[in-house]
Every structure is written in C-alpha cells, then in structure tokens.
C-alpha cells in the first residue's frame, strides 16, 4: 500500500520522472533539470531543483563522484542519480561524440565513422540515404 498516493493502481508507474541536461561539446553541464511526475512519496519531487548543483560539472572520469557529491544522500533521489550516472551519461557521450564525428567526417569522399554502428546508421537505412547518399547501399 502506498499511503501518500492512496495506493498505486496496476499499470501505473511507481516512479515516472525525466532528466534533461544541456551540454556543450566538452560535455560540461550548462543546465540540469528534472521532473518527478509520479513517485512513491509526495515529497520525492521536492529535490528536483537540487540538480542545478550539477551545472559546471563535466561528464568525464569523476562524473559519478561529482553527481553523488551534489545529489547523494538526503540531497537527492536515487532513481534520478541512477539516470544521471547510467543512461544519461551514456546518451550524452553518444550524442556529443556523434555530432563531433559528423563535423569531422564532413570531408567529401570520406565514409562517416558512424555508418553501421547501430540500426539507425545501417548502410541501408533511410537515415544514411538522406544524410550520406554516397554511402547508402541497398539491402
């Protein structure tokens, strides 16, 4: 039973939250935001403004330590910390790296390094056909 929410119905999330980081090419956080739309307790969302403490940190070795310093213990929320240290950091690296590589590989005739690194960048995908038609190959 969840007293704060008068129970949690089947199919309803116990945790429903999001995190958004605005980064530069050096992986420095310029803005950090979060929202807790559903949580086990009504006070869980009170800490989302604490994410501002991440502004100025860089997602690089030591990121997890910095996140824990800013948001660990009673200053934060375990699921939000986990999002930041796990999928958030990985997604940031993939996004920034891909953008940097696209700019570097914009040289005519050079195959972009991201081709065939995932489903979206498969050499026979519509994305490759649109962005790098010279390197598109029919399946």
Model-found features: residue ranges?
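Active-site- and interface-proximal helix/loop "cap" or "latch" segments in soluble metabolic
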Residues: 2-139
């Amino acid at each position: 039973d969840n007293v704060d929410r008068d129970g949690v119905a089947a199919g309803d999330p116990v945790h429903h939250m999001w995190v958004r980081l605005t980064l530069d090419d050096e992986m420095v956080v310029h803005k950090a935001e979060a929202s807790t739309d559903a949580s086990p307790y009504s006070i869980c969302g009170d800490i989302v403004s604490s994410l501002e403490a991440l502004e100025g940190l860089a997602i690089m070795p030591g990121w997890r330590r910095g996140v824990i310093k800013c948001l660990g213990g009673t200053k934060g929320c375990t699921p939000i910390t986990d999002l930041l240290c796990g999928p958030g950091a990985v997604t940031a690296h993939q996004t920034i790296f891909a953008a940097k590589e696209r700019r570097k590989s914009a040289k005519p005739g050079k195959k972009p390094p991201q081709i065939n690194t995932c489903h979206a960048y498969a050499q026979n995908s519509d994305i490759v056909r649109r962005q790098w038609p010279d390197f598109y190959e029919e399946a």
